[in-house]
Amino acid sequence: WDNYPVNDATMKGELHIGPYTGRSAQLAEVSRGLFLNPMNQAEASKIALGAGAAYMNDPKRYDAEDAWTASAAKVVGEASVEALYIFRDACAISPLHPSDPPLLTEIVDSAKHRMDRGALVEAAGILSAHMYKMKASAELLRTNSNKKLIQEIAPWLDEYTQWADIGIDIARAIEAASSYAESLTPSGKTSAFSMRA
C-alpha cells in the first residue's frame, strides 16, 4: 500500500500531481504488488497513477520525469504538458516532495540575489516573467478538453492565478522602488543601501 497521491486528512489542501519518485528499483523483488492510493480528485490522480504504472512495468529502467511527461500527455494532451509542468511545480509539496516548489524557489532566489546587488529592474523582470508564465499556463489549462480534470483542480488553479497576480504586483513595486531610488541618487544608479534607507 503506497500512500500516494492521496491527499486526505491534513493534506486536503495539497494537489499531488508531481512525479512518482523515491521508490527502489529492487522493490519488485521483495513485493508481490503495489497499490497506489489515489486522491479524491480521480482524474487528477491519473497523472501520478500513470507514472506509477510505468514504474511497476519496469522499475529498473524507470525514469520519473519521462514517466510523468508521458502520463501527463495522456491526461491533458501533449500541447498542455508544459503548462501542467509549470502548474505542477507550484503544487510540488507532498509526502514525496516535502521541499518548497523547486522552480518557483529558484526564480525567487534569483530575483532576491539581484536585489541584494541593487539590480532591481533585473530582479523585477525575472519575477514578472515567471508570474506571467504562471498566468498563461493557468489560462491554457482552463481551456483543456479534459473538463473533468479542470473542474477538479479549479480551486488550485484559482489560487495559483492569485499568487501569480501577487507576484506581478510585487515586481511592479520593485520597479517603482527602483525608479524612486534612481531619482534620489545623482549618478542614477540604484544601490541596495539606498533601498534600505
Residue ranges and their predicted role:
Residues 1-65:
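Catalytic-core regions of glycoside hydrolase
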